[in-house]
UniProtKB/Swiss-Prot annotation:
PROSITE patterns, alphabetized: AA_TRNA_LIGASE_I
Cofactor binding notes: Binds 1 zinc ion per subunit.
Name of this chain's protein: Isoleucine--tRNA ligase
Any Pfam family matching the protein: zf-FPG_IleRS
Chain location of the short sequence motif 'HIGH' region per the record: 74-84
Domain notes: IleRS has two distinct active sites: one for aminoacylation and one for editing. The misactivated valine is translocated from the active site to the editing site, which sterically excludes the correctly activated isoleucine. The single editing site contains two valyl binding pockets, one specific for each substrate (Val-AMP or Val-tRNA(Ile)).
Lineage per the UniProt record: Bacteria, Pseudomonadati, Pseudomonadota, Betaproteobacteria, Burkholderiales
Superkingdom assignment: Bacteria
Organism in which the protein naturally occurs: Herminiimonas arsenicoxydans
Record text on subunit structure and interactions: Monomer.
NCBIfam families referenced in this protein's UniProt entry, alphabetically: ileS (TIGR00392)
Region feature Disordered, mapped onto this chain: 1-33
Molecular-function GO term, any one: ATP binding
Membrane spanning stretches: none
InterPro entries reported in the protein's UniProt record: aa-tRNA-synth_I_CS (IPR001412), aa-tRNA-synth_Ia (IPR002300), Anticodon_Ile_BEm (IPR033708), Ile-tRNA-ligase (IPR002301), Ile-tRNA-ligase_type1 (IPR023585), Ile-tRNA_ligase (IPR050081), M/V/L/I-tRNA-synth_anticd-bd (IPR013155), Rossmann-like_a/b/a_fold (IPR014729)
Length: 959
């Protein structure tokens, strides 16, 4: 009793037939058709918590090989967003797939707790004048509160983990171990103090890590500035001239940072470029300009001048020639000379081919000037931490650097050194928190040296980290080149920050020499022991005399805190080998984060582990893309295109969100919108309907006594198991490669096409009309029992709530506490499995052809349903052999009342002939058969229904 006009996977259940005296085997299930996920999922969350399911999974996994996914900690501030949800769901799916694969895969979630964003929140709530002790107290309380909010939302997503014992970077033990890690790096020789330009945010009042810098468009004055000749004789000699036609001349530079001009201390040319000495008339007098030869024409045109090149030389010839500061004649404070230093970083793409150098405000400037002998105390650094010029700076003291641009340009014009000013739009560094422009600013900081040769190790940090990248597996593969490029080109790591809420760089520094106390490693351990008991507050309260005794008066407590990227970057030490070493292991098998973490957590973790251990803290890195809206646009509240995970969970259910994550190729951008979620919901319904059919039709099946051995099953049942075995192998292989969207594609296709569109469609007749305990029906039930065992486990990592709901109903007394203590199902071997897969591939092709013909006849009015038809096939070769082998069961595969096959010589003679049946319809199975009414006591039944209800039952061998 089946009809391929019905929806796939849905039994045809007319109420009239149910109530008749010849009922079919219509079983039911408590697994509802409607998921009602938003209502039911929170009940499962509570049940998992009440039953301590995570702990039971750990108990069941004891003794298995471990798989460690180390959680990159989200920051403990604000509600989780859709990106957080993607990240946590991906992690949860991977942990669960490894768990099903026979591993002990614990998941310890974590939080990043120190740093600027929380300090800013405390300032907003309580003002900027709080004592440090109160800042620490309130920051700790605030972070704790935020963690609880985020934790609740993560748990709601179906993420299983050690939520009652997560790691937090602000845990006293972790803070202490971080100080110990700093001590180890100091002893190894990686850590040094120096004056260097670092990323500096005026709003933060602190240095920034590379990962805290983002780029936005900014409009600035682009100016061409002339530095007057101070040594005209040397200029003449460099250009091969006996004498200059005039001593009035300029080396002209181009810059988009006018505020750096007051701090100029040198000029740079490329040693191999050709430079021209150009004679021109300007403001009624003859002047000479030094410009890159290739840029002369464009530059003069920009200035509105005409001129001629009177001599040329290579850049190297100009080395060490000095020029006056443009403001030298205005104020004696600028009465210094700027020498030319050759630099290969100078380009001739635009500007003048000459660069001005302010070593306090540019990395290349700093390196160039230092390499030519400039000492730290000679560096001109007038910009204060708040972005204002120091009061001692002539002409512009007290102004912010941004408001000073205008008066600087005006003064340059006044002294005749401004050759051109235009407003220029360019991509410029901004603070990722404040969205305000930042600068490079030379300050005294603590660094980890990338190219320092440490003690007892034969390679530098850069070399060690680059070698570690080669030993790391990347998903997707392009992440390797990205991380390699960042490590290869990065400057020394600025470890210190000028903040309060952070792990202290707990050094004692000599008041006069600036040297660290000679017992620093020993002192750091003593301080760590105090922090372990009382947190970082212990350092704040510490009186130096307690540790230094009589030396205390000669030393100052260092006020710097560690970069928060050092906090999270050392969790492989503080967590994997520290607070959670019993649960976890080092190195981790996998770190998984968004693509921005190549310069964030992946990066800092690699550097710290390379310094501490000589290798990476992870065996593999997985990167996922960012979430965008349905049109591929970045999400923002102003655009109104933000999708909140909480809203999706509360309306559609977390399983819908999980299915969306799994179905999307995470290696690129992940698009989400109401329309996309609507499609995902439809896909979910098809999967759920399939599960409902499977559960319903095994509800009266007891595997302990009813299970039919595979060798004794009907052929199509053996095929179904062989097909599931092949698919399970493919899906598990995808899971092992962290590939989810192919899994979802296979599961959807399996439920819709393989089951709903073929196997279950054929099976309905046998399930509904065969004898309740007949071999034919038990064979079908045995097959779908095996399929369900496998299917629920395969879908559980993704559709965790739905799989658990179905598992409890399906497995009954054997369900245990949860599906998540199971491993992938060992499907029984099918001896002729490969042959059956080949055979049924052919049969499905034929069935598709027949179905098309049936539809044409139905549309033309010849039949109402496929069971009203009789089919005569002509086939050749393997196709004929496959069809003929089914004997009288062929009609069940084609879902027609009669089917026959005749052999022909070749494919050109093959055909499908559909004719309406002339027989009566059986009121029970709906087949049109010659023997309907042949039994006097049961006039409405066909012979096989009479046999199934009152006799020995029909014989089925194949389908």
């Amino acid at each position: 009793m089946s009809d391929n006009q019905n929806k796939p996977g849905k039994p045809n259940k007319p109420e009239a037939k149910q109530a008749s005296k010849y009922p079919v085997n219509m079983t039911d299930t408590s697994f509802p058709m409607r998921g009602d996920l938003a209502k039911r999922e929170p009940q499962w969350v509570k049940q998992w918590q009440d039953k301590k399911i995570y702990e039971k999974i750990r108990e069941a996994s004891k003794g298995r090989p471990k798989f460690i996914l180390h959680d990159g900690p989200p920051y403990a501030n604000g509600d989780i967003h859709i990106g957080h949800a993607v990240n946590k769901i991906l992690k949860d799916m991977i942990v669960k797939t490894r768990q099903f694969d026979g591993y002990d895969a614990p998941y310890v979630p974590g939080w990043d707790c120190h740093g600027m964003p929380i300090e800013i929140q405390i300032e907003k709530l309580y003002g900027k004048s709080l004592p440090t002790a109160e800042v620490l107290e309130k920051s700790r309380a605030y972070a704790t509160e935020q963690i609880e909010r985020q934790k609740k939302d993560f748990i709601r997503l179906g993420v299983l983990g050690e939520w009652d014992n997560p790691y937090k970077t602000m845990d006293f033990g972790n803070e202490a171990d971080e100080i110990r890690a700093l001590g180890t790096l100091l002893e190894k020789g990686y850590v040094y103090r120096g004056l260097k330009p670092v990323n500096w945010c005026f709003d933060c009042g602190s240095a920034l890590a590379e990962a805290e810098v983002e780029y936005q468009d900014k409009r600035d004055p682009a100016i061409d500035v002339g530095f007057p000749f101070a040594e005209p004789e040397k200029v003449a000699k460099a250009f091969g001239l006996a004498k200059l036609p005039t001593n009035k001349g300029y080396a002209v530079i181009w810059t988009t940072t006018p505020w750096t001009i007051p701090a100029n201390q040198a000029l740079n040319v490329h040693p191999e470029f050709t430079y021209a000495l150009v004679q021109t008339e300007r403001k009624g007098e003859t002047v000479l300009l030094i410009l890159a030869a290739d840029l002369v024409e464009a530059t003069l045109q920009r200035y509105g001048l005409e001129g001629k090149t009177i001599a040329t030389c290579v850049g190297e010839a100009l080395a060490m020639i000095k020029f006056k500061h443009p403001f030298a004649d205005v104020d004696p404070g600028y009465n210094r000379l700027s020498p030319i230093y050759p630099g290969t970083y100078v380009t001739a793409d635009s500007g003048t081919g000459i660069v001005h150098s302010a070593p306090a405000y540019g990395i290349e400037d700093f390196i160039s000037c230092k390499s030519h002998g400039l000492k730290d105390d000679e560096i001109v650094a007038p910009v204060m931490a708040d972005g204002k010029y120091a009061s001692w700076l002539p002409l512009f003291g007290g102004l912010t650097i941004w408001e000073a641009s205008k008066p600087i340009c005006a003064k340059l014009d006044e002294v005749g050194s401004l050759f051109k000013l235009v407003m220029f739009d360019h991509s410029y560094m901004h603070c990722w928190r404040h969205k305000t422009p930042i600068i490079y600013r030379a300050t005294s900081q603590w660094f980890a040296g990338m190219d320092v040769m440490p003690k007892n190790q034969g390679t530098t940090l850069r070399e060690t980290a680059l070698a570690a990248i080669e030993q790391t597996e990347f998903f997707p593969g392009w992440g390797k080149a990205r991380l390699h490029g960042m490590i290869a080109n990065r400057p020394d790591w600025t470890l210190s920050r000028q903040r309060q809420w952070g792990v202290p760089m707990a050094f004692f520094v000599h008041k006069e020499s600036g040297d660290l106390h000679p017992r620093t490693p020993e002192l750091l351990e003593q301080i760590a022991q105090r922090v372990e008991k009382n947190g970082i507050e212990a350092w704040l309260k510490l009186d130096p005399k307690e540790l230094l005794g009589d030396d205390a008066d000669m030393y100052l407590k260092n006020k710097d805190t560690l970069d928060v990227w050092f906090d999270s970057g050392t969790t492989h030490q503080t967590v994997l080998r520290g607070s959670h070493k019993e649960q976890l292991a080092f190195p981790a098998d996998l770190y998984l984060e968004g693509s921005d973490q190549h310069r964030g957590w992946f990066h800092s973790s690699l550097l710290t582990s390379s310094m501490l251990n000589g290798h990476a803290p992870y065996k593999a890195l997985l990167t996922h893309g960012f979430v965008v809206d349905g049109e591929g646009k970045k999400m923002s509240k102003s655009k109104g295109n933000v999708v909140a995970p909480q809203k999706v969970s509360d309306s559609l259910g977390a399983d819908i969100l999980r299915l969306w994550v799994a179905a999307t190729d995470y290696s690129g951008e992940l698009s989400i919108s109401d329309e996309i979620l609507k499609r995902v919901t439809e896909s979910y319904r098809r999967i759920r309907n399939t599960l409902r059919f499977l559960l319903s039709n095994t509800s009266d099946f007891d595997a302990g006594k009813d299970l039919v051995a595979v060798a004794d099953m009907l052929e199509i049942d053996r095929y179904a198991i062989a097909q599931m075995n092949a698919m399970q192998n493919e899906i598990v292989a995808h899971y092992r490669a962290y590939e989810f969207h192919p899994v979802i594609s296979k599961l959807q296709g399996y439920c819709t096409e393989d089951l709903g569109g073929f196997y279950l469609d054929i099976l309905k007749d046998r399930l509904y009309t065969s004898g309740v305990t007949s071999h034919a029906r038990r064979s079908a039930q045995s097959a779908i029992w095996h399929l369900t065992q496998s299917l629920l486990r395969l879908m559980a990592p993704v559709l965790s709530f739905t799989a658990e709901e179905a598992w409890v109903i399906f497995a009954g007394k054997d369900a245990g506490d949860t599906i998540f203590t199971q491993t992938y199902y060992a499907l029984p071997e099918v001896a002729d499995g490969d042959a059956l897969l080949g055979k049924y591939t052919l049969l499905r092709e034929v069935r598709n052809d027949v179905t098309k013909q049936l539809e044409e006849v139905r549309v033309a009015g010849g039949i109402g349903s496929s069971l009203q038809a009789e089919v005569a096939l002509q086939a050749s070769g393997d196709k004929f052999a496959a069809l003929e082998s089914l004997d009288d069961d062929l009609k069940f595969v084609l879902i027609t009342s009669q089917a026959s096959v005749k052999k022909v010589a070749g494919t050109e003679e093959e055909s499908v002939l559909v004719t309406p049946s002339t027989y009566q319809k059986c009121e029970r199975c709906w087949h049109y058969r010659a023997d309907v009414g042949s039994h006097a006591e049961h006039e409405g039944l066909c012979g096989r229904c009479v046999a199934n209800l009152f006799g020995k039952g029909e014989a089925r061998h194949f389908a």
